[in-house]
């Protein structure tokens, strides 16, 4: 599967990014604007407060106009009567009216940008906090907090994630709403995400574990789905395995499947009833297209959101991430983390619920995203599997047993390997233990995995030297081997049912195959 490489710095998310969407407003009181002098007298010197108010008052006014135009539309403002008649689906629950859906949505946890949190030191050769000054300045939330402006920007420390932290925030939202299924008291859950190093699932600790991972993401660099999923797994594992932590949450396991393949035997092991495990969070960091989601996956993505096991999707637009938790017709409903709020060690729960939720047409989404599925037990898994199979879901694929002993994170599929007879054991793969047998071969060969022996009829003896064909030594006259990565089918008529396919083409003519 072709995926985004989270180790490559991405352009940073804007402070008020939003796809073409409508919004439903929940009235919240705003503090009064500071009483600033609007007359900028250049003879008396430049006044930052005056300049700031002039450039933001226009933006704030236009934003208010947009909000007023959209506030009455809400999530049910579909473009046609047929769309309006469609139910509203929110993480497995279906509602016939906007009011019913609204009551559910406002209970979802939403983590957003914060200002003034505990310092995160700038990494050597990492982005400078000053490079995000424009994003900070043009964030409307700062309009009400100019008195603290000097505390928001430092040269060597990050005290805000405005401009770069939205993927972390949406991943936190996904994880927090997973925990809601395990713990009733939401204030206890939010305490685990507070922006300090002491909180196990804070932005600070997301960065800490990602910076030490193979991805080596630095503070100020944009997270991708891969970095986000790896951070979630490492933080969850550390939370439960660290004996000094107060584990108020029941234990859950985390499984990352970049290939979107799920193996019954592996799931059963992770949900072993004899253990203290109370569930399994499955994370699927995927890329479902090139510039936008391929229409081939539309129905499958909506189907996943309709299941009771769904805990949402983090992703959305290029260089901006949103938390998607439902849909109506072909419009996905999401929360926007780009509205920054002031950090406080005393948690204000009202700042952790969405004050607005929006929608966007599925065809306008960025194809790179992180899909979350929470499975409570084996019965829940069987129900999830049956639903996906019945719906012919094209994103998730199920298998009885694991076919490889190599951890998925180590499968690079980027080097030549020796192919032995013991590597090829069923009818899906051809035997190429002799070069001269390639003369009539034009099939695809999967070189990505070291397969576990499953066919008891194969010879048990260790293959001899003549049975081993070092692929890297084959000459062009004998066989040309090329590798290709097919990200997605180019048409919904394509018969492929996989999100992506890594293949090796063996051409006996000596010509490279496209």
Curated annotation (Swiss-Prot):
Q: Where is the composition biased (Basic and acidic residues)?
A: 1-15
Q: SUPFAM superfamilies under this entry?
A: Cysteine proteinases
Please give one Gene Ontology molecular function term for this protein: cysteine-type endopeptidase activity
Using the UniProt record, give the first listed, main subcellular location.
Answer: cytoplasm
Query: What residues form the catalytic site here?
Result: 166, 336, 338
User: InterPro entries per the record?
Assistant: Papain-like_cys_pep_sf (IPR038765), Peptidase_C54 (IPR005078), Peptidase_C54_cat (IPR046792)
Tell me, what does this protein do in biology?
Answer: Cysteine protease that plays a key role in cytoplasm to vacuole transport (Cvt) and autophagy by mediating both proteolytic activation and delipidation of ATG8. Required for selective autophagic degradation of the nucleus (nucleophagy) as well as for mitophagy which contributes to regulate mitochondrial quantity and quality by eliminating the mitochondria to a basal level to fulfill cellular energy requirements and preventing excess ROS production. The protease activity is required for proteolytic activation of ATG8: cleaves the C-terminal amino acid of ATG8 to reveal a C-terminal glycine.
Q: Please list the residue ranges that the record marks as compositionally biased, kind Low complexity.
A: 472-489
- What's the source species for this entry? Scheffersomyces stipitis (strain ATCC 58785 / CBS 6054 / NBRC 10063 / NRRL Y-11545) (Yeast)
Q: Keywords for this entry?
A: Autophagy, Cytoplasm, Hydrolase, Nucleus, Protease, Protein transport, Thiol protease, Transport
A Pfam family that the UniProt record links to this protein: Peptidase_C54
- Stated name of the protein: Probable cysteine protease ATG4
- Does DNA damage show up as a keyword for this record? no
What gene is this protein translated from?
ATG4
Family affiliation:
Belongs to the peptidase C54 family.
The segments labelled Disordered in the record are 1-28, 61-84, 461-514
Give the location in the cell: Cytoplasm; Nucleus; Preautophagosomal structure
Signal peptide positions on this chain: none
| Catalytic activity, as annotated | [protein]-C-terminal L-amino acid-glycyl-phosphatidylethanolamide + H2O = [protein]-C-terminal L-amino acid-glycine + a 1,2-diacyl-sn-glycero-3-phosphoethanolamine
GO cellular component terms listed in the entry, alphabetical order: nucleus; phagophore assembly site
UniProt GO BP: aggrephagy; autophagosome assembly; mitophagy; piecemeal microautophagy of the nucleus; protein processing; protein transport
């Amino acid at each position: 599967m072709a995926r985004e490489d989270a180790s490559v710095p991405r352009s940073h998310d804007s402070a008020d990014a939003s796809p073409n969407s409508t919004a439903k407003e929940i009235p919240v009181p705003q503090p009064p604007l500071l009483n600033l002098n609007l007359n900028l007298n250049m003879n008396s010197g430049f006044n930052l407060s005056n300049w700031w108010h002039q450039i933001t008052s226009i933006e704030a006014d236009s934003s208010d106009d947009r909000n007023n135009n959209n506030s009455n539309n809400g999530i049910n403002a579909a473009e046609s009567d047929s769309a309006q008649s469609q139910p509203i689906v929110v993480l497995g629950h279906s509602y016939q009216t906007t009011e019913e859906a609204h009551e559910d949505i406002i209970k979802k946890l939403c983590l957003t940008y914060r200002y003034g949190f505990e310092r995160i030191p700038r990494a050597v050769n990492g982005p400078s906090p000053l490079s995000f000054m424009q994003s900070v300045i043009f964030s409307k939330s700062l309009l009400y907090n100019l008195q603290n402006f000097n505390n928001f920007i430092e040269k060597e420390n990050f005290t805000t994630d405005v401009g770069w932290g939205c993927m972390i925030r949406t991943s936190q939202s996904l994880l927090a709403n997973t925990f809601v299924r395990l713990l009733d008291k939401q204030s206890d859950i939010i305490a685990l995400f507070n922006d300090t190093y002491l909180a196990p699932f804070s932005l600070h600790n997301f960065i800490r574990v990602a910076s030490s991972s193979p991805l080596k993401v630095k503070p100020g660099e944009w997270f991708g789905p891969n970095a986000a999923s790896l951070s979630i797994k490492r933080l969850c594992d550390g939370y439960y395995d660290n004996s000094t932590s107060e584990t108020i949450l029941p234990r859950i396991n985390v499984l990352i499947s970049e290939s979107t393949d799920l193996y019954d035997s592996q799931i059963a092991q992770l949900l072993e009833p004899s253990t203290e495990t109370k569930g399994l969070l499955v994370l699927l960091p995927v890329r479902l297209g090139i510039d936008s989601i391929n229409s081939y996956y539309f129905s499958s993505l909506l189907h996943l959101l309709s299941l009771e096991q769904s805990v949402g999707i983090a992703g959305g637009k290029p260089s901006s991430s949103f938390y998607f938790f439902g849909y109506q017709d072909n419009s996905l409903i999401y929360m926007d983390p780009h509205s920054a709020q002031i950090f406080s060690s005393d948690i204000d729960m009202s700042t952790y619920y969405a004050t607005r939720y929006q929608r966007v047409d599925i065809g306008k989404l960025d194809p790179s995203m992180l899909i979350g599925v929470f499975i409570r037990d084996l019965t829940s898994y069987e129900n999830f599997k049956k639903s996906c199979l019945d719906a012919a879901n094209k994103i998730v694929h199920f298998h009885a047993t694991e076919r490889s002993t190599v951890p998925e994170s180590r499968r690079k599929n980027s080097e030549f390997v020796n192919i032995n007879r013991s590597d090829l054991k069923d009818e899906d793969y051809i035997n190429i233990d002799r070069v001269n047998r390639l003369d009539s071969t034009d099939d695809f060969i999967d070189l990505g995995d070291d397969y576990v022996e499953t066919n008891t009829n194969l010879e048990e003896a260790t293959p001899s030297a003549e049975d081993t064909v070092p692929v890297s030594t084959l000459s062009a006259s004998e066989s040309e081997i090329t590798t290709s990565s097919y990200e997605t089918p180019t048409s919904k008529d394509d018969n492929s049912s996989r999100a992506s396919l890594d293949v090796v083409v063996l051409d006996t003519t000596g010509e490279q195959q496209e």
